[in-house]
């Protein structure tokens, strides 16, 4: 039987296309198989993760974390309940280990190591209040040893932590006992680190520290530093400006207004010194108290016609009065 040329071409073409169609059908079936395999693999990964997570030992939690990381490498783009649970575990585990590591370094007084651990955490999470707080503590204590290498960073961390507190973004006070204690310490530390280079900002920080419901409200050192910062900062600046603008010139309304501002700053400084003396009640504080009292007497006399009359009464009653 003869097959026409046209029919032969049709049959031949059909024969050539059959493998293609067959492959196409096969390709359409494979995703279903792949999806099943993926689901099975995903369940296996999750089951392994749960097996380790159920056991509360440190080693099992570490293994669960490794399982979770592998799970997210394969299925991190998914958003089902299991994937969300794994992501939550990773976040909480990393938070715990970071806090443990940074606390260990800080507890050992290895302040440089504390910063090494904290820096990359803040790069990923700039508003991590816990880390900002620990680094401020570490940086402040490092400065007390005479090492100023961490001061610049500590100042920035303290400013950021204070901003978070002032903006109401801090819901958990850790590493501090309370938000007020955090506000007190952070401002005291900031003021202490700035008191030489920027006394105006330092005075503002010390004022916030003593106004907080924290131990710094009754800390004589905080009040003494507040008084010194007022004198070295705004009082000195305004006095220099006053002498330049109004020295040996007739009085004027502008001159009087500036003079009144300077006088008020002096009164604020005296008040801070007086509170420092009044709050120095323990035997261990007596040597420091006597030094501050000598400074206070000279300062008070300058503003009271070279007389210290009324100073003792002021010391006795100052704690019953509000800050000026």
Regions inferred by a protein language model and the residue ranges of each:
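Bacterial N-terminal signal peptides
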Residues: 10-20
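N-terminal leader/linker segments that initiate helical-solenoid repeat arrays
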Residues: 21-108
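Flexible helix-coil transition and linker loops at the boundaries of alpha-helical arrays
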Residues: 30-35, 72-92, 119-131, 145, ...
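Generic helix N-cap/helix-start motif at coil->alpha-helix transitions
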Residues: 38-46, 59-64, 90-101, 113, ...
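Structural register within alpha-helical repeat arrays
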Residues: 51, 71, 101, 135, ...
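Short coil/linker segments at helix-helix boundaries
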Residues: 51-62, 84-87, 96, 100, ...
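Tetratricopeptide repeat
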Residues: 65, 115, 155, 203-204, ...
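Terminal, low-structured helical/coil segments at or just beyond the last alpha-helical repeat
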Residues: 172, 247-249, 256, 260, ...
């Amino acid at each position: 039987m003869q097959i026409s040329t046209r029919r032969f071409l049709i049959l031949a073409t059909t024969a050539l296309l059959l493998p293609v169609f067959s492959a196409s059908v096969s390709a359409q079936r494979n995703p279903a198989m792949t999806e099943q395999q993926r689901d099975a693999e995903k369940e296996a990964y999750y089951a392994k993760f749960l097996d380790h997570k159920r056991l509360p030992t440190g080693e099992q939690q570490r293994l669960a974390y490794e399982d979770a990381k592998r799970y997210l490498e394969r299925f991190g783009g998914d958003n089902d309940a299991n994937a969300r649970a794994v992501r939550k575990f990773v976040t909480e585990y990393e938070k715990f280990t970071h806090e443990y590591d940074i606390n260990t370094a800080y507890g050992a007084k290895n302040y440089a190591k504390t910063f090494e651990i904290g820096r990359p955490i803040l790069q990923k999470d700039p508003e991590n209040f816990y880390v900002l707080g620990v680094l401020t503590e570490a940086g402040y204590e490092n400065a007390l040893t005479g090492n100023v290498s961490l001061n610049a960073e500590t100042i920035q961390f303290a400013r950021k932590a204070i901003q978070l507190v002032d903006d109401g973004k801090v819901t958990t006070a850790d590493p501090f006992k309370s938000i007020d204690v955090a506000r007190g310490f952070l401002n005291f530390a900031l003021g202490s680190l700035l008191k030489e280079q920027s006394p105006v900002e330092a005075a503002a920080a010390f004022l916030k520290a003593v106004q907080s419901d924290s131990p710094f409200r009754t800390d004589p050192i905080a009040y003494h530093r507040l008084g010194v910062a007022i004198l070295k900062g705004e009082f000195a600046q305004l006095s220099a400006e006053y002498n330049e603008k109004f020295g040996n010139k007739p009085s004027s309304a502008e001159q009087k207004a500036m003079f009144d501002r300077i006088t008020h700053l002096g009164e604020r400084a005296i008040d801070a010194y007086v509170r420092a003396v009044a709050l120095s009640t323990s035997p261990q504080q007596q040597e420091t108290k006597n030094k501050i009292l000598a400074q206070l007497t000279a300062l008070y006399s300058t503003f009271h016609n070279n007389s210290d009359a009324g100073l003792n009464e002021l010391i006795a009653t100052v704690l019953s009065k509000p800050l000026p």
